[in-house]
Swiss-Prot record:
Gene: holE
Protein name according to UniProt: DNA polymerase III subunit theta
An annotated Gene Ontology molecular function: DNA binding
Keywords: DNA replication, DNA-directed DNA polymerase, Nucleotidyltransferase, Transferase
Quaternary organization: The DNA polymerase holoenzyme is a complex that contains 10 different types of subunits. These subunits are organized into 3 functionally essential subassemblies: the pol III core, the beta sliding clamp processivity factor and the clamp-loading complex. The pol III core (subunits alpha,epsilon and theta) contains the polymerase and the 3'-5' exonuclease proofreading activities. The polymerase is tethered to the template via the sliding clamp processivity factor.
Lineage: Bacteria, Pseudomonadati, Pseudomonadota, Gammaproteobacteria, Enterobacterales
Length: 76
């Protein structure tokens, strides 16, 4: 199913953006990269914070089944 995200209404676009933020937090947690989920949650709109928590739980559960690649931070 292909969908043009630019044609979504603003409320759906906000939900997509919040879901993307939750996926980013779960990704960083999976690779033991520094991230503070509460700080990212506070950056989300007030009415979508519960959606952020739901999506974060879903992404965390999905990442249990995924393999890990070694994370090597950039050396300066």
């Amino acid at each position: 199913m292909l969908k043009n995200l630019a044609k979504l209404d603003q409320t759906e676009m906000d939900k997509v953006n919040v879901d993307l933020a939750a996926a980013g937090v779960a990704f960083k947690e999976r690779y033991n990269m520094p991230v503070i989920a509460e700080a990212v949650e506070r950056e989300q709109p007030e009415h979508l914070r519960s959606w952020f928590r739901e999506r974060l739980i879903a992404h965390r559960l999905a990442s249990v089944n995924l393999s890990r690649l070694p994370y090597e931070p950039k050396l300066k």
